[in-house]
């Protein structure tokens, strides 16, 4: 079908984590419940890492970030959810949203139930699904063959790892697999390459679903240089090759990137190269500009 718009689609699925996924979801929030985010759950730093070390469970920080960016009706509940403790006490640095999600996780049968309770409280229409409902961490093999455990340590590597994997081996959330199966459009990125994007692709069931889906797939590149040293050295072609290596098939049809990205070696896919930067924070995507670029990509794909 020609001239489809995002509003015509029944199911749009975005994968990733951190600020990047939240930005994509907020730029497409007009889709309401037709929009689904599959969220990385391997963070082990900051408030999230402290909660995991103390209480166990999945990482809630990326999920909280997505929920924060999807709030459209400010309320007492949203102010509480976004509150971060200051000072020097035991709660210093903790985000109340992380603690609320963890508390509801304790009160629920499944983490997904906790997320849906918070979504209803915050009046968030988009569906949000953790990539797995079991605790899992990212692990890498560095260029010396050493095992490097956890996102925080992997981001501090001087060179790209030889291999990345999840530990332990956990199943994907079944609703995440079903969302990919039902998708009309799939988006990957932006976000920290190794620690926000790759974890979802390392789950066997999600990789298999991405191999099988007929839905067009779009990779959204970062704006500016990554803070993670190993990821900062990767080119656009490197990233596309690595994602598809772990997925197991050439599946990415389109890349959406800013004007400073070298796309000269990307000759086998559609490239949408536009100004995407937000005026207030240059390395963040402007919601409307990103929305427009995705519309252009969808129409070019036909």
Curated annotation (Swiss-Prot):
The keyword Disulfide bond does not apply. This is Putative gluconeogenesis factor. Belongs to the gluconeogenesis factor family. The gene is ybhK. One of its GO terms (cellular component) is cytoplasm. It comes from the Bacteria. The lineage of its organism: Bacteria, Pseudomonadati, Pseudomonadota, Gammaproteobacteria, Enterobacterales. GO terms for molecular function: LPPG:FO 2-phospho-L-lactate transferase activity. NCBIfam families: CofD_related. Pfam families: CofD. The keyword Kinase does not apply. Gene3D superfamilies: CofD-like domains. Keywords: Cytoplasm. One of its GO terms (biological process) is regulation of cell shape. Required for morphogenesis under gluconeogenic growth conditions. It is found in: Cytoplasm.
């Amino acid at each position: 079908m020609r001239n489809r718009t995002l509003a015509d689609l029944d199911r749009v699925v975005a994968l990733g984590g951190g600020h990047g996924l939240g930005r994509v979801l907020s730029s497409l929030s007009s889709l309401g419940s037709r929009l689904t985010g599959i969220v990385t759950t391997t963070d082990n730093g900051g408030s999230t890492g402290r909660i995991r070390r103390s209480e166990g469970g999945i990482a809630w920080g990326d999920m909280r970030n997505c929920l924060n960016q999807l709030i459209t009706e400010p309320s007492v509940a949203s102010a509480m959810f976004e509150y971060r403790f200051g000072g020097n006490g035991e709660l210093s640095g903790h985000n109340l949203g992380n603690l609320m999600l963890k508390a509801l996780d304790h009160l629920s049968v499944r983490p997904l139930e906790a997320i849906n309770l918070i979504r209803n409280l915050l009046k968030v229409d988009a569906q949000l699904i953790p990539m797995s409902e079991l605790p899992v961490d990212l692990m890498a093999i560095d260029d010396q063959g050493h095992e490097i455990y956890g996102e925080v340590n992997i981001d501090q590597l001087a060179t790209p790892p030889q291999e990345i994997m999840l530990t332990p081996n956990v199943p994907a959330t079944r609703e995440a697999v079903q969302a990919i199966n039902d998708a009309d459009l799939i988006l990957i990125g932006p976000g920290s390459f190794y620690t926000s994007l790759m974890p979802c692709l390392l789950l066997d069931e999600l990789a298999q679903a991405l191999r099988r889906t007929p839905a067009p797939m779009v990779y959204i590149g970062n704006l500016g240089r990554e803070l993670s040293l190993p990821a900062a050295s990767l080119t656009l072609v490197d990233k596309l090759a690595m994602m598809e290596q772990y997925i197991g098939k050439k599946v990415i049809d389109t890349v959406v990137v800013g004007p400073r990205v070298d796309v000269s070696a990307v000759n086998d896919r559609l490239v949408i190269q536009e100004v995407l930067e937000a005026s207030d924070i240059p390395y963040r995507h402007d919601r409307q500009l990103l929305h427009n670029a995705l519309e252009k990509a969808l129409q070019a794909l036909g």
